[in-house]
Amino acid sequence: MRAEIISVGDELLRGQRVNTNAAVIARMLSAIGVSVSHIVACSDDEADIMATCSAALGRAEVVLVTGGLGPTRDDRTKHAIQQLLGRGTVLDEASYRRIEERMAARGSAVTPLLREQAVVIEGSHVIINSRGTAAGMLLDCGEPFAHHHLILMPGVPVEMEAMMHEGVIPFLTSLSNSVICQTPLKIVGVGETAIAAMLVEIEDAMPPATMLAYLPHTAGVDLMVSSRGNSREAVEAEHQQVVDAIMERVGTLVYATREISLEEVIGEMLLRQTFTVAVAESCTGGLLASRFTDISGASTYFQQGFVVYSNEAKERALGVPHETLVAHGAVSEEVAQGMALGCLEKSGADFALATTGIAGPTGGTPEKPLGTLCYAIAVKGGGVVVCRKVVMQGTREQRKVRFSTAVLREFWMLLKEREASEE
């Protein structure tokens, strides 16, 4: 099954908003074996919407449109599709009742503009909007687009994503008899080119129905293994064979085979081992602490964080010796060790992670170029167990992400070794 995604909105074409909806939809479609052939951004002009949707329906069996279903004058998608299909509109009573209940809970009445949110194109299968007011619509288009489907959803990301999960994906799955298996392999600290070089022979030998996608990101690359066919048993067996071969080659670099962040995996490991952690940060400016505390329940294992940007703060808050700072400079392995030990002592945690470096774009020297990172990990009762100096490329923002990821990856490896030694 082939699909196209159309995102409606002048704000997308002006660069005022990033089109995140299309990426989310494409990922969800890929997971059920639906191929996306085009992703298009379209203006709010009715003629443009009609022309764009007409062209898409001529190429794809399913066209998903987001945006233009709201209550304002620039929300023209519904009227444009009415014109394209030659249909009228009706009030969807169930959607209207939900709007009434939502407004009553706020002590407000339903305005004419809000009522319009429950008006749908004739012949629509209504997609419930569990997060907002604008009803979604699933349309069997009829001639000249017989057996082609048009799906209309709001442009608000949280509303669109809920509709995809609750209405669109179940519908599209029912149209397909094919079986698809997907396994993500999550990797940080190693780039796409290096991983690809390790997997050349495996890719050359892969069955035609199995694909390997490389999804590079700031801190590394994720792999997605996808297999498709008509027999579940055969597809699953073929898929697992390829995954096993890849894991045999690069498995030590893979921190997870499910959709989960590195910090979430570390959190799970800390919970299993009943350990706690604290961080002392200079160049990462609190990003490490933020990544830990982005996870619900992190208070169980995350003790505290220190952001010590100046030399005085490193001395005052963590007890880094003045002599060490003078002799080696703030960006040095010696200072990273002092920060980790001070953090361990002040926090009482089982582990302390420390970062100091030069994120740029200024501050580099021949001896300590831009992108230099010094980091250390200290363990209660064991002192400093990891201390490294590396140089990383990128913008200031990219380096901060890569710096924090480098430390987290090192911490993950340390925890993994400890788990293995206790088995």
Swiss-Prot record:
Question: Which Pfam family would be a valid example here?
Answer: MoCF_biosynth
**InterPro entries for the chain:** CinA, CinA-like_C, CinA_C, CinA_KH, Competence-induced_CinA, MoaB/Mog-like_dom_sf, MoaB/Mog_dom
Family per similarity comment:
Belongs to the CinA family.
PANTHER family for this protein: NICOTINAMIDE-NUCLEOTIDE AMIDOHYDROLASE PNCC (PTHR13939), NMN AMIDOHYDROLASE-LIKE PROTEIN YFAY (PTHR13939:SF0)
State the protein's name: CinA-like protein
